[in-house]
């Protein structure tokens, strides 16, 4: 089934349904389509027969379009979903049926305004990641995908770029439901050897891959752009069909033609880096002066660039007609890639590795990429709040990040300097020492108080992209501990937000919290995330607690993983019931059985004990 919405407005929309019917030649076949609105109410129905003159065994049938008055449009804020029900009868008997969800929305791309959804300008504020889900690895669980999306959305993200393969069918369907825009990607390089793990050469089966991919995903309203490849214009062997010698342009045009055969409603792109035109890279002496975008970027319908956001204005001077999307941005430069962009004219940004993932670790004992804003457990680092200050400017924000100089990293990765400024919220340090920290804010100014004493007031420097919304406080006196409070104020001096961190005392208890205690389905696949935090007598997290935690569980669930959030540990996630806590925390992931029942979780650590009782529910 292929569902399109050729005309969309707040007052009226048309919905067109196309189906493929096989094995109909000797029968009187009728096809009926019924549309239901998000509440399940029938809002339209149409019937059609088969074409009279064709010898095709599998025939595409376009049913007459239906017009809906006052449609409920799909958007990030209100992801309204309709259902299209198709029933096929042969000689009066029902022989097949199919139901598909879809959304009513319009997409527009332009070099003048970037991207519009339903006629409204939207700047994509995205994440580009590999598809693993923390301790679960590449296993697909709906709850884990939804949890990740909701956490990103709560920090102002509205888009995810799939990298560098189609994600699960569940991923896009959950994005439909949650209201996350998706840039759907086919593959990495167009190579028969490198970056391709298939049993057959990529250039032999590309047509099958594209057809299967587009047909599977084309009804998803969350998907706004097809990405056909990534960082391939640097070697001819990565850029498609041998002998074309045009850095992928011919291959792209062929791929794009097949994409349009199966979906004419979306544009296509290819993410470009690290070469300029002619495959000139940083290793060539003319690189810094030769600001000509790669040939393929000038041929794609949307020009996607990874990194080098400071060169985009020069690219647009060379080719003003480019519709420009920053498909990867370095997290190490924080908000600079975001503020380097002309947000009125460009499509958006996707930070590479906003969430920690496995692989590309650079060094032992690290297991993956951790130059990120979110831990692989989805716990936010302080830098995530900096991103939130820009992604959600309407919400006053201030957040403290204490500098951990020993944890800082910086490496050259694929011609990009990447790394991380290690920050935390711990205020347990050596008496008499000094600590530097940042306050991240979108307010006019911040006052810092240490144990009630003012360290001064600093204004937010909004004139420089590399300093905006981040205020540095050097050598703040720790004394004997206590509290640090950041107070954010507007231009009039009125307090608009504050954040407080405190020195924790001795560990006395375990705080055990289930994330969705009343929503745990007994379907054999639903997950329950349980977060364990070691606290002192005042309920403050004890950051320097690293004792082992032991778990006992019984009831209608099974233990999937123990995850302390440490990206450097060599401890297992699975098949264990005890693990060292990290920064006083542990995440427990449980999976329901198929029968409803009670679940009891008993936890102990160095004399601290706690019990959590839950129930799974059969729908």
Model-derived features: positions:
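Secreted/periplasmic carbohydrate-active enzymes, especially glycoside hydrolases
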Residues: 1-164, 174, 178-182, 219, ...
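Substrate-binding/catalytic cleft of secreted carbohydrate-active enzymes
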Residues: 149-152, 159-407, 411-415, 426
């Amino acid at each position: 089934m292929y569902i399109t919405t050729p005309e969309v407005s707040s007052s009226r929309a048309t919905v067109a349904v196309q189906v493929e019917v096989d094995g109909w030649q000797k029968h009187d076949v009728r096809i009926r389509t019924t549309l239901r609105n998000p509440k399940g109410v029938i809002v339209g129905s149409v019937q059609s027969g088969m074409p009279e003159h064709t010898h095709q065994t599998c025939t595409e049938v376009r049913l007459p379009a239906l017009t809906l008055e006052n449609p409920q449009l799909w958007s990030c804020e209100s992801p309204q979903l309709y259902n299209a029900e198709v029933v096929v009868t042969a000689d009066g008997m029902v022989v097949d049926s199919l139901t598909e969800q879809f959304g009513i929305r319009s997409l527009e791309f332009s070099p003048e305004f970037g991207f519009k959804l339903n006629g409204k300008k939207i700047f994509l504020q995205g994440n580009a990641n590999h598809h693993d889900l923390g301790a679960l690895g590449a296993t697909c669980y709906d709850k884990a995908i939804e949890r990740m999306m909701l956490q990103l959305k709560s920090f102002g993200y509205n888009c995810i770029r799939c990298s560098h393969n189609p994600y699960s069918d569940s991923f896009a369907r959950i994005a439909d439901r949650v209201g996350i825009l998706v840039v759907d990607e086919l593959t990495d390089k167009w190579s028969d050897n490198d970056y391709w793990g298939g049993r057959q050469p990529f250039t032999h089966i590309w047509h099958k891959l594209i057809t299967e991919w587009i047909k599977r995903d084309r009804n998803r309203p969350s998907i706004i752009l097809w990405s056909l490849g990534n960082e391939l214009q640097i070697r001819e062997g990565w850029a498609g069909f041998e002998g074309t010698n045009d850095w992928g342009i011919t291959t792209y045009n062929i791929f794009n033609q097949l994409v349009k055969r199966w979906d004419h409603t979306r544009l296509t792109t290819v993410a470009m880096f690290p070469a300029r035109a002619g495959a000139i890279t940083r290793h060539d002496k003319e690189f810094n002066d030769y600001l000509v975008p790669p040939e393929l970027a000038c041929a794609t319908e949307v020009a996607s660039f990874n990194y080098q956001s400071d060169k985009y204005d020069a690219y647009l001077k060379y080719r003003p007609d480019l519709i420009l999307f920053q498909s990867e941005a370095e997290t190490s430069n924080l908000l600079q890639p975001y503020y380097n962009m002309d947000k009125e004219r460009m499509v958006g940004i996707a930070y590479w590795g906003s969430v920690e993932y496995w692989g590309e670790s650079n060094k032992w004992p690290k297991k993956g990429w951790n130059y990120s804003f979110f831990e692989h457990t989805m716990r936010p680092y302080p830098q995530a709040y900096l991103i939130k200050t820009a992604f959600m400017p309407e919400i006053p924000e201030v957040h403290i990040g204490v500098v951990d100089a020993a944890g800082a990293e910086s490496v050259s990765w694929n011609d990009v300097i990447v790394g991380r400024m290690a920050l935390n919220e711990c205020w347990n340090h050596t008496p008499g020492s000094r600590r530097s920290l940042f306050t991240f804010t979108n307010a006019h100014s911040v006052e810092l108080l240490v144990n009630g004493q003012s360290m001064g007031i600093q204004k937010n420097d909004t004139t420089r992209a590399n300093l905006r919304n981040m205020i540095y406080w050097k050598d703040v006196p720790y004394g004997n501990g206590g509290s640090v409070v950041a107070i954010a104020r507007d231009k009039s001096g009125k307090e608009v937000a504050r954040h407080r961190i405190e020195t924790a005392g001795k560990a006395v208890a375990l705080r055990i919290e289930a994330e969705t205690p009343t929503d745990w389905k007994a379907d054999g696949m639903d997950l329950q995330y349980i977060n364990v935090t070691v606290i002192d007598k005042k309920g403050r997290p004890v950051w320097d607690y690293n004792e082992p935690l032991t778990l006992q569980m019984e009831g209608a669930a099974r233990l999937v993983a123990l995850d302390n959030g440490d990206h450097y540990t060599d401890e297992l996630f699975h098949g264990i019931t005890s693990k060292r806590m990290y920064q006083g925390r542990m995440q427990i992931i449980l999976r329901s059985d198929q029968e409803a029942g009670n679940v009891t979780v008993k936890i102990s650590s160095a004399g601290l004990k706690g019990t959590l009782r839950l129930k799974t529910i059969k729908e």
